[in-house]
Amino acid sequence: MSDLLTVENLRTSFHTHGGEIRAVDGVDFSIAKGGTLGVVGESGSGKSVTALSIMRLVDLPGRVERDSSITFEGRDLAKLREDEMARIRGNEISMIFQEPMTSLNPVFTVGDQIAESVRLHQAVGKKEADERALEMMRLVGIPSAEKRMRDYPHQMSGGMRQRVMIGMALSCNPKLLIADEPTTALDVTVQAQILELMKDLRDKLGMAILLITHDLGVVAEMVDEVAVMYGGRIVERGPVSEIFANPQHPYTEALLTSIPLLGMRYTTPLKAIRGMVPSPLDWPRGCRFAPRCDYAFDRCTTELPPLFEVGRQESACWLCESGPRAVRQAAAN
C-alpha cells in the first residue's frame, strides 16, 4: 500500500531570547493510505508540535526548518504557500484538538460551526452546508441531531463536544485525520465511546489516522503501528503488537513497566521513570534518554544513536546496534 504521508527530517524550532528550542529534531515516519499510526511519549516529547508542524500551524517564534520534508500525496507541505496550504488544511487533512471546549467558538451554535467549515472548503450554499452539518452530527452519534445543531458549546457535555469536533473534522471527507489527545479531557466511559466511534468512522470512510497520545491503552486499542517519541526524536517504531510484546528501546520498556496491570497486587510497586525530560534548550550530547536510563553506558552519553533495524521494529539504542537488545540486568541494579 502506498504512503499517503511521508515525514522526513522534520525539525521545528522556537527561536527565543533564551536560545533555540529544538522541540522536534529530525523526525521521520510515514502513514499508508487508510493506515493508523500512534505517536506516544511523555509531555514535552514533541508529539503535539509534530502534529502542528504537519498542519503548518506552528506560531511564531516557532518555525519548521527549511530542510524538513512533509510529503502529502506528492506535495511537500513544508514548501507550499500559505494560500495553497489553506486549501488542504481542514479539507484533505483535518485535526481534532485536545480540548473541545476551547476549540469551539462559544458564540456560535455547533451546527453553524460545522456548516462554516463545509462552506469554506466545498463552495456550497448555506442550505447544502446545513444539510451536511446535520448529516455529520448524525454520523458521529449525537442524539436528536436536528435539535442539537442549535445548541451552543456550553450546552453540551464534554463527550458531545468532542463528537462535534470529530464531525467538523470529517465534514469535508479528509484523507488524513490528525487526532491530538482526543480523549484527554473525557472520563473513561466516554473515552471508550469516542475511540469506538473513531474506529468505526475510519473503517467506514477509509481515511488514515495519526493519533497523538500519552496513553498506551489508547494506542493498543486504535493503531496498527506506533512511534515512541522522546526529546524531540523518535526512539522506537514498529507494529504495535511487537512493540508491546518486546520493546527494544529502554524508554519504551520504562513506559510499559510504569503502567498498573489488571490483577496486580497493591503491594507491588510500580516502576517510575527517574528524573525529568531534559530541556530542549540544551539536549544532552548523546542519547537524550541516557541520564534517566538504567542501561546506559559510556557511549550513550557521547554519541546520538540512529534508528537500528531490529526485525520489524526500529530502535535508537546502541544496545540494538547488532540486533535485538540483549536481556540483562539494568546497570542501576
What spans do the regions from the language model cover?
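A short, flexible loop at the N-terminus of ABC-type nucleotide-binding domains that lies
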Residues: 4, 13-26, 57-63, 81-84, ...
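ABC ATPase NBD coupling module
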Residues: 63, 77-94, 112, 120, ...
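ABC ATPase nucleotide-binding domain helical subdomain, centered on the C-loop/LSGGQ "ABC signature"
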Residues: 123, 127-142, 149-150, 245, ...
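A short, proline-enriched helix->beta-strand linker immediately N-terminal to the Walker B motif
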Residues: 171-175
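Conserved ABC transporter NBD signature motif
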Residues: 65-76
